C-alpha cells in the first residue's frame, strides 16, 4: 500500500482580544478549518483566557460570545471547544452557549 501526502492550505486563525487601558485583559482563539466532507468550514475555539483581575466580571462569556459570532460570520457549520479541565462548572459555563459534551478527545503530546 502506498500513502500520499497532500498539503492543504485550509486553516486560518483569529485571535479575539479584550483590551482594557491598553492592556490585554482576556483572549480567545478561533481556528477555521475545512475538510473534504463539508463545503463550509468548522470552528475550533481554544485558549479562552482572562487575567485574574478580570475574573467573575463576565469577560470570559463575552469572549466566547464574540467567537461564536465570528464563527457564524465565517460560515462555520459547527464549533468545537476543548478544555484540559473536566470540572462540572466548566461544562455548565460552555453549556450556556449551546456547547455540550460530545464524545471523547484523544491526545498525544509530541
What kind of region is each of these model predictions?
Residues 71-83:
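Conserved GNAT acetyl-CoA-binding A-motif
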Residues 61, 85-103:
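Conserved active-site alpha-helix within GNAT-family acetyltransferase domains
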Residues 48-50, 83:
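Hydrophobic adenine-recognition pocket in adenosine-nucleotide-binding enzymes
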Residues 106-110:
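Short beta-strand-to-coil "C-cap" segments at the C-terminal boundary of structured domains/repeats
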Residues 1-39:
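Acetyl-CoA-dependent GNAT
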Amino acid at each position: 500500500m502506498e500513502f500520499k501526502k497532500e498539503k492543504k492550505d485550509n486553516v486560518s486563525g483569529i485571535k479575539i482580544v479584550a483590551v482594557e487601558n491598553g492592556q490585554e485583559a482576556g483572549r480567545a482563539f478561533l481556528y477555521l478549518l475545512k475538510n473534504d466532507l463539508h463545503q463550509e468550514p468548522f470552528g475550533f475555539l481554544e485558549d479562552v483566557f482572562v487575567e485574574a483581575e478580570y475574573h467573575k466580571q463576565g469577560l470570559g462569556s463575552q469572549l466566547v460570545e464574540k467567537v461564536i459570532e465570528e464563527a457564524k460570520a465565517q460560515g462555520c457549520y459547527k464549533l468545537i471547544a476543548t478544555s484540559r479541565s473536566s470540572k462540572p462548572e466548566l461544562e455548565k459555563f460552555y453549556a450556556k452557549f449551546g456547547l455540550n459534551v460530545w464524545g471523547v478527545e484523544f491526545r498525544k503530546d509530541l
